[in-house]
Amino acid sequence: MLSVLVNQVSDKVPFAGGVAQDVAAGTNSTVGAVDVMQTATDVVAEYVKLTGAGRARLVPVSYVDELLANLVAGGASVVEPLSGVPVEVCDIKGRAAAGELLVADERTIGAEFSSACRLGAELAVAEDARVPGYVVVCMRKCCIPWVAEAVEAKACSAENVIVTATGAEEQASARASRHAASDAAQVVAAYLACHPRVGVVRYPGLKTDPSFARATSQLVGGFGPYVDYIWKELPGEWHRFVAGDEDVRKQIINFERLG
């Protein structure tokens, strides 16, 4: 009975993203072949496109906390595209338009889900398995001079960074996993919205969610893995389901067992 309900829900849920997958079966594959001959310069150029930046630099991981602290001291706010409990979409576009200096930390959700610099963030920070030990710091077109100088002071030349032999496949796998988890979360959210014991569900991909309009205009290719909900018998107490990339039926069955 449960599998029938999951299939009915998943059939009605649209999926968006750069991954070809069978969510119910838990399988996924990246679209296109993995380029194993990439250079660090290629990686940087890719993130410029993903985030809508003007340029990007590689910064050693050991310097990232110091860089962010300096930016915050200068008036910047570090935000994540998805944050809070219940989960909501950060209004990067609106806050930037209102004059906030924003640094979008995309290391958790993945830069492929948010074109933060295009939306108005001054910087976007991302991780990539192809360049371990570094973060990719993307700068908005016409970046504020002192912000750009702070980044350049910590940056390394991409020409001096070597892409690891297995990095391209690891990164492709990580992106496929994130997209599969996002698509699974969409099914789980729809399932919980119909659950007799659940009173409230928050997921940016649900049309009834307060963040839905913002999510559809500011996120790309999916709505993330986080689904927050409240049991009817425990009003006011939020719980979180973090979707994975495995068979969504198994995820729901495990949820029911634990719930």
Regions found by a protein language model. Name each.
Residues 1-196, 202, 208, 258:
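Conserved PLP-enzyme active-site core in the AAT-like
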Residues 170, 178, 186-247:
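Conserved small-domain helix->loop->beta segment predominantly found in fold-type I
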Residues 1-8, 58, 232-259:
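PLP-dependent enzyme catalytic core of the Aspartate aminotransferase-like
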